[in-house]
Amino acid sequence: MIVSPSILAADVLNLESAAARMIAAGADWIHVDVMDGHFVPNLSFSPSVVRALHERFTIPLDVHLMLDQPEKYVEAFCRAGASSITIHEEIAADRAEILRCIRAQGVKTAVSIKPNTPVDAIIPLLPLCDMVLLMSVEPGFGGQKFNPV
């Protein structure tokens, strides 16, 4: 099992100390939720935050792109130090091509689905994925109640 707490709930003025506490508590990775205000109704971290965490810590950074157009940002997050990048099944873009682009940069790949998306929707993408993220809440906000769907 890999413990990968999200830094989304941290005080944005104290991300460095929040990351240090996660590591001290035994986190294996740090999960970085990236939101664009379109795919989900919230905004969060940019590649510069991932770069800052990468420069200060050696822990793997698991970047979750909740973006309408992740293809525009994948290379920037790879360069910033992402260890893995997750994209969503529900986007309109060519998901397979995005996953290939991520892998070509030496970064692990993952695909995610929202709670009501059928699991079999991701079957064609599995050969291109190192991981799968099954959302237990609707993406966009931290601290939600678990959805047993």
PLM features: residue spans?
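Conserved N-terminal beta1-alpha1 strand-loop-helix module at the mouth
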Residues: 1-86, 92-94, 100-104, 108-109, ...
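Short gly/ser/thr-rich secondary-structure transition/capping motifs
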Residues: 112-116
